[in-house]
A protein has these predicted regions:
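Regulatory sensory and allosteric helical modules in signal-transduction proteins
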Residues: 48-56, 69-92
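A short, hydrophobic, proline-anchored segment that marks a local hinge/packing element in signaling
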Residues: 102-112, 120
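A short, polar/charged loop-to-alpha-helix boundary motif
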Residues: 61-74, 126-135
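Short, basic/aromatic recognition patches
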Residues: 14-38, 76-80, 89-96
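Gly/Pro-rich active-site capping loops and adjacent beta-alpha segments
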Residues: 115-172
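Short, small/polar residue-rich loop motifs at catalytic or cofactor-binding pockets
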Residues: 37-41, 101-103
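N-terminal leader/propeptide and maturation segments of large enzyme subunits in energy/redox metabolism
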Residues: 1-11, 149-201
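Generic short beta-strand
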Residues: 43-44, 107
Length: 201
């Protein structure tokens, strides 16, 4: 299929705008200053089957957009029965992560009843457990000492937050009452992206 330059530019900018809207929704609602002020986050759109990057916004950190590709691929490998409204959480550095405090949310995007793409974001959480606040310790000798490590797990099931999984996460991190102020905006951002991408298509 061939695209003329004008159509290509319209599609490219439309997809970029979807990512920007996700990013702005996340940063405006996030509780943590490291996300809302230091802007340590990013959003992207990924291929339905391969998990490869399709589009990224102008506002987030480019390094996250690249590593989210591998996290999205890890989700795809484990999410054979993804449904609308599902949101997966992952921070495992061995599955395409950076460090453990960079938590990824990955959501399947359905269009006309079929899986069409994946929407993903990364946010740096101030703490996700481990032997010291913030996760960085010169005395750590293994990854288990650094932070709680999450393989791809479905945190939202068909739009409903799994309170049991949430309680496991919050029970293993400091200032847990503040993290819900990042979790909900981070999960809501791809929902904003869904609406924008549907309108674009």
């Amino acid at each position: 299929m061939e695209l003329d330059p004008v159509t290509l530019a319209v599609v490219q900018n439309g997809l970029q705008q979807v990512c920007n809207e996700m990013d702005l929704a996340f940063v405006r609602a996030a509780f943590s200053p490291v996300i809302s002020e230091a802007l340590d986050r990013s959003d992207g759109i990924y291929h339905r089957d391969t998990g490869e990057l399709i589009a990224q916004g102008e506002l987030g950190l480019p390094v996250f957009v690249g590593t989210m590709q591998f996290s999205t691929q890890a989700v795809i490998a484990r999410a054979a029965k993804a449904k609308p409204g599902d949101v997966y959480i992952v921070n495992d550095p061995y599955l395409g992560g950076t460090h453990l405090m960079d938590v990824k949310f990955v959501k399947p995007f359905f269009y006309r009843g079929r899986l069409f793409a994946w929407l993903a974001n990364t946010g740096h959480w101030p703490d996700i457990g481990g032997m010291v606040p913030g996760g960085f310790s010169a005395n750590a000798t293994e990854v288990e000492q650094e932070c709680l490590r999450l393989p791809p797990v479905r945190l939202y099931k068909e739009g409903v937050l799994d309170e049991e999984i949430l309680s496991i996460i919050l029970s293993n991190i400091r200032i847990a009452d503040q993290r819900i102020g990042d979790i909900k905006p981070q999960a809501a951002a791809p929902t904003i992206g869904e609406k924008s991408l549907t309108a674009l298509l």
